[in-house]
Each structure stands twice: as C-alpha cells, then as structure tokens.
C-alpha cells in the first residue's frame, strides 16, 4: 500500500532547548494557523513568529501532497488545504482500486502514444484501412489532441470536440475554422475508432486509468442517402455513351453486382465461361501513400459470382487476345485502370452526355444497387443475395435492401388458410 501525507511548506515546529540540553519540538498553535489561513493572500499580516516560519514562508503554494508508489516518491503542490486533502484521498482510493496512474505517465502526450499505436497498426490490418485511420488521425485527431497530456484528456473536453466536429469548427490539419462539418458516420470513425484506440492503448499500458471516450455521446446518424435503382433501359442509356469495352464494364457492374474496385481488379483468368462465373478475390484500394493497390475484398471474403448468359459475348470481347494474368477491364494503354480514373474519365462524362448527371444519389455504386433490385425481383432470397454480393451477414443485406422485398403477408395468410382444419 502506498503511503501519502500532506506537508505544510510555510509552517514548521519551533525547536526549544531545555535546561538539560534536550530538544523539544513545539508545533504552531491553533491561533497561529487560523491567523495564517485568514491572510493567505498576504501572509505577513498573520504576524507568524519567526520560529514557526520555514525558509519558503509565503512563497508559492502552501501545501504539498507527498506519496510513494511504484518505488518512487511523488509530490503535488496545492494552495488550498481542502483541495490537497481531496487529492490525497482520491489518490489513495485510486491506488486501492488499481486505478492509480504514475504522474509521469499522465504527462505523456497523446501524440507520443499515437506514434506507438501507429507502429502497432502496420501489418495488422488491411493497407486501405490503415490508410483511412492514419488520414483521420492526421487531419482531425492530432490537430486537437496531439500536444495534450493524457492526464488532461477528459470526457467533457472530448464531448466539446465532438460538437466542434459537427459544427465544422474543429481544428483540422493544424488550422482552425475550416468550416467543414463531419457527417455522423465519419465522426464515429474519428472518435470511437481512431481517437478511442489510441487512448485504449494508453489504458492497457497503465498510462490512463480509464478511457474518457467511453462516455462520449455521438450525433445520431442521418438517413442514408437515397439509393438509386436503374432500369435496364437507363443502364443502356449510360452504356451507350461509352466505348464498347467500357459499356461492357457497365453491364458487368449492373448485372453481376460486383463493386467497381472488384471489377477493375479482375483478371481474364478470373472468368470461367464454362460455368459462367467470376472469381472475386481482389479489389482496388489505396495505401498510406495514396497509391492504388490491390487487396482482399471487403470483409476479407472471396466469392464466386454468377454471370448472366447475355454477357458472354461482351466478356469474350474484353478477354480476346489477352492472357489469363491480364486485366479484364484495362486502362487505355493496358495495365491497371484505377477507380478514380474510370470515374473521372469514363463514368462522369457518360452521365453528362446521357443527361443523367443531375440525378440525386446516382453513383457507380448505383449499378450494384440495381443488380440487387433485379435479383430480388427475380426471386432471390436473402442468403443467396448475401453470398453473391459479398455482404458480411444476411442482416446487412436485409438492412440495405429491406424495402425491395415485397410484402407477402397476405400470401402467407392465404397459404395457411388452405391448411386449416376446423
């Protein structure tokens, strides 16, 4: 058990020498202490006898809390005795309940701990996820908390920061007042994933007694942006504004449900025209240096996707004359076509040419939603659609497309009615 005590820096015992030569320590009287307490702003007015004064009488804070823990002696000064006593009591309670944090550790800055956290990230998660975390750390977290000691990060301050993220007043990239509000989904990632993860590391190392982010409240999620489901006619209108190869790419997106990054990572060898399937095992992403890379699909799950017969000729056209290791959808000069280039140079110009660029919510991902709507219309059940689209769970599929499944409660009642025996 650690020992703690409070020391009066201004007053000391007077030493009296008796006739026999022995020494007696005489503490200051209650009257002396009361007088000094009444004149803390001007100690000389208390008229404390010199014999009770220390060498630092009237200088700095009057009270010092001393304690020993982890084999070291520590101290903290206070002007007010009650605050010193409250600190000492809380200190001993923290030690008894294993919440004690060495003051030196509490003075570590958030930025110092973040560097350790970053080192632990490398190789433990996908490069694209690492890149997103580091970007959020650099843009939003470090500008506010990088230089702040761990011991000064509290729930109230973190909650005020969340309010700034919502309003757009939070420091960003070291600059203040950029007027860029964050969406609730982004705030959750910045606060409850990145910021919290660094503080979790501090807690696990004993540098913080508890994570102040645990009690922080986040803004409620806003309704998901309206999903756009295209008709086959609308898909063709867009494809008709592209060259033949990219038109086939649009048809693949709309009628197989693969993501754009997955499509652009497909090799010719990933296509099996005997079984009419695509083997989706890679997708495009970006690394910490913002370079396009290939990684595993979302959720680290590979899958096999069926190809409608109507796409056979188009796929054969894309693969004609190209080896199994070559990309199925290629850049104009061959090689990898990046998602950004395809969006900027192929997709967006085609939308403008088709007069569809002002449709709210229409993105490349709308082609994937279109596939889901057509599959459900064709009778696909939840588990089948989940497997084809690569969702993490059937619940995700339901949450995303629940509005597309028809309400068949009437049919159920009619079917059960046929079984009733009265």
Question: Which stretches of residues belong to each language-model region?
Answer:
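C-terminal secondary-structure termini that scaffold catalytic or DNA-interacting sites
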Residues: 240, 275, 284-313, 317, ...
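Short, basic (Lys/Arg/His-rich) helix/loop patches that form interaction surfaces
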Residues: 171-174, 236-247, 256, 305, ...
